[in-house]
Amino acid sequence: MAVQGSQRRLLGSLNSTPTAIPQLGLAANQTGARCLEVSIPDGLFLSLGLVSLVENVLVVATIAKNRNLHSPMYCFICCLALSDLLVSGSNVVDTLLLLLEAGALAARAAVLQQLDNVIDVITCSSMLSSLCFLGAIAVDRYISIFYALRYRSIVTLPRARRAVAAIWVASVLFSTLFIAYYDHTAVLLCLVVFFLAMLVLMAVLYVHMLARACQHAQGIARLHKRQRPVHKGFGLKGPVTLTILLGIFFLCWGPFFLHLTLIVLCPEHPTCGCIFKNFNLFLALIICNAIIDPLIYAFHSQELRRTLKEVLTCSW
């Protein structure tokens, strides 16, 4: 499956669709059917990447600055930010390489192709590690709620560091294999199963945490004989928070893995071909997730926000 010139080179070998038409509208696929195609300009990719890059650099710098944030939970959050940083950074570099290939450095296509292969490995490994750290954060929060008294003995900093190292090593290893054997159906299926496993893990853990929180709120309400007001107020906040958290995860990552699934199930079907045409949009959603992650997992912390102000004012 060759990489088309107008497609993102980020894992672009997965996209076997014809060259995209640069506008939002109805485009004809190989069978003449009409389908909606959303073109994402290079400038938009570059802008999204730069915003995410700056945002996640601030998260990493903030956690590194404050020793009070050197805990297992913030270790996972920092690594999530680092993964998103690499996704964004590789996107920025990839966009610049696309522009350079069309410009003065077109004669050095071989050098750019080698650099692009390295970027593909970095991008793929950072995407896998980002999913892993989202799962690790969910597990950490689950343990902190259901094993609160033993949390500090279960989730220690050395164990968190070993988990982080294992995630990075596994991500680099599997991403290298993925890039090398991208045309094997088993590889694509493994990626899809991995995404579904992370989705199920997060859904089960967060739903269980929500149920425990509801039970706790009801217990407090009965204790103070104010069951209805407390239950009503919490009943709105809890499900809404859970819906936003899981909804954003599925919205940003789901289309990309749907793309991989359809490559296996119906690579030649006209309807699937219409979905393939929006490959660039699916990648843009992943970059958007890298922008949203710090807002959900990092900036909700008052301590982190206070330290962020010090970082922005250069109070080191």
Curated annotation (Swiss-Prot):
Q: Which UniProt keywords apply?
A: Cell membrane, G-protein coupled receptor, Glycoprotein, Lipoprotein, Membrane, Palmitate, Receptor, Transducer, Transmembrane, Transmembrane helix
From the Swiss-Prot or TrEMBL record, state where the protein is found.
Cell membrane
Which residue(s) hold a covalent lipid per the annotation (S-palmitoyl cysteine)?
314
Q: Which GO terms describe its cellular component?
A: cytoplasm; plasma membrane
Positions glycosylated per UniProt: 29
Extracellular compartment residues: 1-37, 94-117, 183-190, 266-278
Q: Does the keyword Membrane apply?
A: yes
Q: Where are the transmembrane segments?
A: 38-63, 73-93, 118-139, 163-182, 191-210, 240-265, 279-299
Q: How does it sit in the membrane?
A: Multi-pass membrane protein
Molecular function terms from GO: melanocyte-stimulating hormone receptor activity
Q: Which family does it belong to?
A: Belongs to the G-protein coupled receptor 1 family.
Role played: Receptor for MSH (alpha, beta and gamma) and ACTH. The activity of this receptor is mediated by G proteins which activate adenylate cyclase. Mediates melanogenesis, the production of eumelanin (black/brown) and phaeomelanin (red/yellow), via regulation of cAMP signaling in melanocytes.
Quote the protein name from its UniProt record. Answer: Melanocyte-stimulating hormone receptor
